């Protein structure tokens, strides 16, 4: 019996294997959330703002990994004291395609402070984030969502738009992973949800939040400094 066809088949198989291997090595195995976003943009019927307060922390790397694995981008409202102490994590936030924003320096009740003290909290955070490589923030979230005319005025003087939230995940209050997923399911186009960098239950919820948004053709967007609403990344 002739062995010609068998030899030809083996040679073809080896050549195909080489081609497949070459292609695999030429194509990145992972994408950042920012790189993956254009492929999904056509399916987006709206955008929501995922936000995480109080970082960067020891939980930040795991959170960034979860977000990028699930093709999500988010706004990270960093405390200035932690940005100053962890500049590499601020740079990691930016590298992962996240937006970095101001959440005061020490997380005080700003409405109980003088105008000069409020200014110091905001200004020092702007400097800490910029110095860490996070750019100059355009968004500001007052701690506890507490604000008044003075807080808004000082933030505006620094070129910041104040952002509160439409949906509170209650992760700061011990909400379960299921409860956090249900909270995210209430988001509608343009709305913003409050979550926290340090919450283990929130970290566990990220894949299911991504699935829920995709099922409703909603995408994670940036928060517009002009309107304070979530919009397509620009």
Where are these regions (language model features)?
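Secretory targeting and sorting signals
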Residues: 1-38
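Active-site beta->alpha N-cap acidic-glycine motif
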Residues: 38-113, 117-118, 124, 128, ...
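C-terminal domain-boundary segment and adjacent tail
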Residues: 40-44, 66, 70, 83-85, ...
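Structural recognition of the beta-strand scaffold that forms the well-ordered cores
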Residues: 48-52, 74-78, 99-104, 138-142, ...
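Soluble non-cytosolic domains of exported or imported proteins
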Residues: 54-61, 84, 112-119, 145-146, ...
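Active-site beta-loop-alpha junctions enriched in small/polar residues
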Residues: 55, 79-81, 105, 143-145, ...
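Alpha-helical scaffolding segments of alpha/beta enzyme cores, especially the outer helices
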Residues: 62-65, 88, 92, 120, ...
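His/Asp/Glu-enriched short active-site or ligand-binding loop at hydrolase and phosphoryl-transfer sites
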Residues: 146-187, 218-229
């Amino acid at each position: 019996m002739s062995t010609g066809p068998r030899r030809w088949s083996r040679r073809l198989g080896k050549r195909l294997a080489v081609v497949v291997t070459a292609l695999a090595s030429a194509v990145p195995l992972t994408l950042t959330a920012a790189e993956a976003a254009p492929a999904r943009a056509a399916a987006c019927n709206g955008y929501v703002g995922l936000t995480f307060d109080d970082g960067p922390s020891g939980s930040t790397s795991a959170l960034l990994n979860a977000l990028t694995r699930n093709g999500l981008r988010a706004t990270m409202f960093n405390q200035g004291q932690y940005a100053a102490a962890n500049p590499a994590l601020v740079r990691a936030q930016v590298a992962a395609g996240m937006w970095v924003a101001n959440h005061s320096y020490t997380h005080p009740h700003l409405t109980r402070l003088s105008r000069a003290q409020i200014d110091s909290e905001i200004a020092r955070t702007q400097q800490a984030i910029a110095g860490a490589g996070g750019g100059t923030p355009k968004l500001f979230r007052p701690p506890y969502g507490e604000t008044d005319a003075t807080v808004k005025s000082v933030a505006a003087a620094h070129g910041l738009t104040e952002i509160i939230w439409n949906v509170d995940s209650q992760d700061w209050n011990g909400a379960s992973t299921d409860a956090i997923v249900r909270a995210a399911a209430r988001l509608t186009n343009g709305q913003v949800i409050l979550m926290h960098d340090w919450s283990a239950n929130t970290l566990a919820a990220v894949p299911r939040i991504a699935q829920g948004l995709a099922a409703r053709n909603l995408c994670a967007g940036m928060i517009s400094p002009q309107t304070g609403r979530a919009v397509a990344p620009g």
